[in-house]
Regions:
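Short alpha-helical segment of the dimerization/phosphotransfer core of two-component systems
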Residues: 27-32
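Short flexible loop/turn segments at helix-to-beta-strand junctions
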Residues: 17, 47-57, 78-80
Length: 163
């Protein structure tokens, strides 16, 4: 569906309304692909069949590359991790903090292997920490981080992710 919508979007013969609908189709297809990827990762972790591809990355660069919408400040450190899955996890956590907290911006504060997301208000806290099962991305994010030997913990209005 995603490929089909991209092909249609390239056509010069579409009116504005049709182009808008084709764009919406493409966005929905991307969301579905991400959802299926999250479900697949979660299932492999639960079945103890996940085989992460580890590579060395800088934590600050990882956060910045994973989520251009969320500012990241601080000083990174080199870690060996499954960069793609962790990047998706961090992006999901930040998105959930914004959506469920009904706020426009959160920020990642990076200190070596420790990543702190703030503010995570009272409405978003239970969802982002995985206590309230309303966001698949947050649940899978926690699974990924913990499967790689890290941790996710909420302290006040700060979500701390240790890689």
């Amino acid at each position: 569906m995603f490929g089909f919508s991209r092909t249609l979007a390239r056509s010069d013969q579409l009116d504005e309304r049709t182009s808008r609908f084709i764009g919406m189709m493409g966005e929905a297809a991307e969301q579905m692909t991400e959802l299926l990827d999250q479900l697949g990762t979660s299932a492999r972790i639960a079945a103890d069949r996940w085989e992460p591809v580890l590579r060395e990355v800088d934590t600050l660069e990882l956060v910045r590359e994973a989520d251009a919408e969320t500012p990241a400040v601080g000083e990174g450190a080199s870690v060996e991790t499954e960069a793609d899955a962790v990047g998706r996890a961090l992006r999901s956590l930040a998105r959930a903090a914004r959506v469920y907290g009904r706020i426009d911006e959160v920020t990642w504060h990076v200190d070596g292997r420790a990543l702190e997301l703030a503010p995570v208000n009272a409405e978003a806290g239970p969802v982002v920490s995985g206590e309230d099962v309303r966001d698949l991305g947050s649940l899978v994010a926690r699974q990924v981080v913990e499967a790689l030997g890290g941790s996710v913990a909420l302290a006040g209005e700060t979500l701390r992710v240790e890689l």
